[in-house]
């Protein structure tokens, strides 16, 4: 396998493990449900040796490559461990989805369909706001928390920004929305990675939604309000990574210039605390 593919394959293996979609391949390069017979693992796209990450095939429908790949027998315990972990995550996700779906009907409302006065007193009102990432002239953490983008080629000087040098701080900015009441939390997500995040306007920081239940609830509500469908990549990010992986993904997304505004929706999301 080319060296440049190792991170890509490793990331696919990790995501498949956390999303519960990792499956087993036997010595004959055939899918199997018997963990003890597993010689390789597949992410759905790559058939991989779990020990050395050698790519046996780029596709489960083309299992003719590297048939004579031989690696240490020590890989079988590792494969078994990864498959069991994937199975546990799949079971946990099924349970969390069931819980989320029940809670969503009770906790999530669209403002144009239900009187906002009926929202619980302790409810936290969440709005959707545009988010941009900019190259600042002096990208220091201190200035990153205070300076707005002055790029004349863009027309979003009134938007809150995330500076690339300090991805977890939201600079003070004049919001271009006029909420009917004070809004302290704004929700958005990376257009490249689909990572859902909450922006705490009081503390000026970013909260990555590490809880699978919280991620599922918020993402489902936002996509429902946006009338959008969940793509496989977004679903993988939403349910798959652990808290540490979510933070890493958020850091990468926030620090990239490809982190653009994702749109703003008139509907409000009300989630009970």
Curated annotation (Swiss-Prot):
The cellular location(s) given in this protein's UniProt record come to: Virion
**Would you tell me the Gene Ontology cellular component terms?**
T=13 icosahedral viral capsid; viral outer capsid
Chief place of localization: virion
Record flagged with keyword Methyltransferase: no
Key words of the record: Capsid protein, Outer capsid protein, T=13 icosahedral capsid protein, Virion
Q: Name one Pfam family in it.
A: Capsid_VP7
Q: What does this protein do?
A: Interacts with VP4 to form the outer icosahedral capsid with an incomplete T=13 symmetry, about 80 nm in diameter, and consisting of 200 VP4-VP7 trimers.
Q: How does it assemble?
A: Interacts with VP4 and VP6.
Provide the protein name.
Outer capsid protein VP7
What is the organism of origin for this protein? Answer: Aquareovirus G (isolate American grass carp/USA/PB01-155/-) (AQRV-G)
- Whichever gene encodes this chain, its name is S10
């Amino acid at each position: 396998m080319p060296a440049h593919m190792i991170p890509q394959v490793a990331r696919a293996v990790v995501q498949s493990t956390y999303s519960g979609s990792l499956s087993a391949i036997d010595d004959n390069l055939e899918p199997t449900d018997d963990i003890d017979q597993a010689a390789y693992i597949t992410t759905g796209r790559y058939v991989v040796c779990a020990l050395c990450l050698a790519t046996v095939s780029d596709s489960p429908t083309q299992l003719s490559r590297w048939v004579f790949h031989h690696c240490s027998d020590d890989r079988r315990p590792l494969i078994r461990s990864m498959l069991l972990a994937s199975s546990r995550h799949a079971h946990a996700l099924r349970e969390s989805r069931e819980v989320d779906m029940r809670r969503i009907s009770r906790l999530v409302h669209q403002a144009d369909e239900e009187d906002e006065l009926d929202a619980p007193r302790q409810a936290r009102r969440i709005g959707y706001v545009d988010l941009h990432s900019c190259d600042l002239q002096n990208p220091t953490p201190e200035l990153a928390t205070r300076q707005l983008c002055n790029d004349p080629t863009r027309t979003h000087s009134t938007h809150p920004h995330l500076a690339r040098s300090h991805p977890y701080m939201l600079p003070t900015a004049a919001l271009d929305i006029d909420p009917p009441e004070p809004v302290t939390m704004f929700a958005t997500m990376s257009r490249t990675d689909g990572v859902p995040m909450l922006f705490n306007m009081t503390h000026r920081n970013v909260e990555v939604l590490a809880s699978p239940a919280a991620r599922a609830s918020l993402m489902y509500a936002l996509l429902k309000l946006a009338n959008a469908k969940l793509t496989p990549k977004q679903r993988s990010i939403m349910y798959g990574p652990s808290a540490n992986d979510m933070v890493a993904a958020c850091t990468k997304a926030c620090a990239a210039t490809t982190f653009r505004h994702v749109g703003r929706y008139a509907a409000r999301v009300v989630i009970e605390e």
